[in-house]
């Protein structure tokens, strides 16, 4: 209830007065959405201790149907595929610590992420749409060399890489400038925030 009230208060009055959501199919009909973006991330796998990362990425969302799961409202469904790169600056190399070696030090890390999601879109007003994206992501992390010491105070090699798979979920919204270009913002896991521009030819 509180969340709904906050969202309602923050949503533009013009959008709240619009009844676009009540008209199934009344939205831009495109085959694919291409969305380059900037992103803010966190260390999502337990081998890396923490901190905030910055990077760039892109999504390609392939439309499956312009009439979504609920036939009485204006919604659509797509499959989203992505590639993101994130860089983290030198916090402690906790992946050694988590593996029982007691390693502390300062190294940087680079992550590549490959999200695969179902994108469920809701067209709530003439210029506004929102979406949810459940799915999974494949990640690969590469950790640079650094001055790391184990629990005994002995210098050890902090260079390391690993690959894994994890659950993913995002919520987001778009402001549609027209039928082919929109500003897109996304919040969720594993990325905290993405901001990009969607092209829908």
Predicted regions and their residues:
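Flexible, solvent-exposed loop segments that connect beta-strands
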Residues: 47, 85-109, 140-163
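Short loop/turn motifs that connect adjacent beta-strands in outer-membrane beta-barrel proteins
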Residues: 16-31, 65-77, 123-130, 177-180
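Predominantly the C-terminal beta-signal and adjacent terminal strand-loop region
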Residues: 19-20, 27-30, 82-85, 155-201
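Residues on the lipid-exposed face of transmembrane beta-strands in outer-membrane beta-barrel proteins
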Residues: 36-40, 56-62, 83, 114-120, ...
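Bacterial N-terminal signal peptides
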Residues: 1-10
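Short glycine/proline- and aromatic-enriched beta-strand/turn motifs that initiate or cap beta-hairpins
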Residues: 14-66, 188-190, 194, 198-201
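Residues that define the transmembrane beta-barrel architecture of outer-membrane proteins
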Residues: 30-32, 50-56, 75, 108-114, ...
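Sequence/structural signature of outer-membrane beta-barrel proteins
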Residues: 39-47, 65-67, 84-92, 138-145, ...
